[in-house]
Amino acid sequence: MRPSFLDAEVKRQRDLRLAQLIQQRDQPAALATLAFNALVYPPAHPYHRSATGDSASTAALDSATVRRFWERTVRPARTTVVVTGDISLTEARALLGRWLGAWRPASGDDAVTPPATNPPSQPAKVYLVDKPGAAQSVIRIGGPGVERSDSAYYTIEVMNTLLGGSFSSRLNTTLRETKGYTYGAGSGFSYRPLPGPFVAQASVRTDVTDSSLVEFFREFKLLRDSLVSPEELDRAKSYLALGLAGDFETTGQVAAQLNGLLTYNLPLNYYDQYVPRVMAVTAADVQRVARRLIVPAQYTIVIVGDVEKIRPGIERLGIAPVAVTTAPM
């Protein structure tokens, strides 16, 4: 736990990352995600920028900066070790004592995460990022979601499975199977210590960009306005319940699940409760959560595509004001 951060190695990794950032400029999906986060979250919010940095912040890195960050953030008092596999508690403690027993924090104070407030609600708006000649339009629709600690977590999971969280979801069935606009469409809540984004997304043919938006917003409205059928609800709940075992197939997966419990301060018997609580979700629960969290009138819509071809049709829809922007790089 005493990395040297040699100048040459830091420079090599920095230059590699800068090259990756340049490559992102040619990746519409990456541009859409960067633009979406920057537009949903205000500049002072930690989710406004990519966790992997941008060109300016990356170019400024040197070994002293990296070492200072390490010493302030990676400290014994802030560290939890998860061990899985064919090993006893006694053996694990002995190994940790051998390799980490002498670890002491560097001098100086711990890093302090500045407080952040939830982004304010704002009227829906469409932002276009120009990619001339693009055969497809990359669509991101959504806004701030919820914290992992939200009391309706299980209902949210069921609701999103219905909307866009599985292959048989409404968004994928409509946009892929029925309309043939895309190879896949979906949605999801990003659970984080602060409310991460809710995003519905797809990459669609350029000529059906406006038509795809119509279908997205139709599905949002349907989920809010109508009770889901018993058959569809049972299918979504079974999808989540039966999929749980697949999250524990390897020791790495077991460690990841335990780490999630620790990160979000969940009880160690959380997974004993998971299936019963998922199966207890009702159609009324789903509609109530949809009305609270699926709010199209406040959504940010980001589309990366050929602006000259897609803008007229989107403006004719009248779903929200339209502006052209760029993705932060």
Regions inferred by a protein language model and the residue ranges of each:
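Hydrophobic side chains in well-ordered alpha-helices
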Residues: 92-95, 171, 212, 289, ...
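Non-catalytic beta-strand/loop surface segments
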Residues: 11, 23-77, 102-150, 161-211, ...
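Short beta-strands and strand-coil junctions in structured, solvent-facing domains, enriched
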Residues: 2-7, 89-90, 102, 106, ...
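Small-residue-rich helix-loop
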Residues: 221, 228, 234-241, 245
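Non-catalytic, conformational "gating/processing" segments within enzyme and secreted inhibitor domains
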Residues: 63-99, 297-300
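Divalent metal-coordination and catalytic microenvironments
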Residues: 17, 66, 81, 141, ...
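A common structural junction motif
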Residues: 1-5, 99-107, 218-228, 317-327
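Short hydrophobic/aromatic beta-strand micro-patches
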Residues: 82-84, 201-203, 302-304
